[in-house]
């Protein structure tokens, strides 16, 4: 069983170290991660500047690129083999609801998914790495349950299935207080907080993106609700952004626009 690990917090982050330590006992694990923090980089790829692969003292390889860059380079030229699973995280903070659109953690996992490999993005719901070892153990528990079916596909004993992509958020709780796992949908957030404006020493205005908005749609069945109840939320994702419900309306609108005069 071969697993590729990436993240968006950088190769030295506590989350990726804890995840590696938890998974190396159940699989062959390779780490390829960004050199620096690349939060909120989504699926961005670096197209106009060169990237370099370096190896840290602990064997982790790191790249001066985005999370998606790291997975892309690993899968298309660095590893020399096809992993059975791509795992991203553990992120320093939640990736729930609208966060998934911006998240570099999700973006790294999605890059693996786009290459036809099952993938999971793991995040811890609060920043600061408190109880990160507990979060890593929860990630290990989930992956351990998936290994038999992944190995069966890899060995040809089970028919291959389309790749899947999971977004997993782990509550920041001590051992024994995590209630279990719950499959749920994405919630929604309110719009982000206002931009923060400061003045530089030269008198110029500087702008900082404000924090994520609070939960807006967080009722039962959402990832927000599950994690506040002490559960690890599991949300299956896909990349089809088509608004299927409104397709007929826009088809009618387009027909009116394109009829011959």
From Swiss-Prot:
Phosphoprotein listed as a keyword: no
Cofactor: binding comment: Binds 1 divalent metal cation per subunit.
The protein, known as: 5'-nucleotidase SurE
GO CC list: cytoplasm
Chief place where the protein resides: cytoplasm
Known cofactor(s): a divalent metal cation
Record SUPFAM superfamilies: SurE-like
Recorded name of the encoding gene: surE
